[in-house]
Amino acid sequence: VYQEIPDNVNSDASQGTPMYVATYSANPDIKMAITDHGGLTASLPTYMKAAGHGTEDVCGAGFDLSAPIVDGINSGYIDVVIDQQPFIQGYMPIVQLYLTTKFGMAGLAMDTGAAFVTKANIDAVAPLAALQIR
């Protein structure tokens, strides 16, 4: 089931709880929730608890990594996230601008979305998420 996310929920993920509960109430056989940005991903535990789901009822997945998402992974409500490594997304363009301006170097290509984070590897990146590096 695809659920369009209204602008108010995209802006303030805390407003998504009634929508999540209604979607799952109307479709109780859904077994996976995939969100499309960090605010919604961080809210998955809240949404799932409000819908009466335990950690084994619905697989939670999403994008980005933050301290609340680390908590969600550790609690079992979020199973996997794609860490887009936002520090690199912000840092590398500045490096590229400098290299192009100073030395005329061509553009760099860097894949910043290749890291899957789960309970198996969360301990390695959790301190970096707390510092907003990962």
Task: Identify the residue ranges that each predicted region occupies.
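A residue-level marker of the well-folded mature domains of exported/periplasmic proteins
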Residues: 1-134
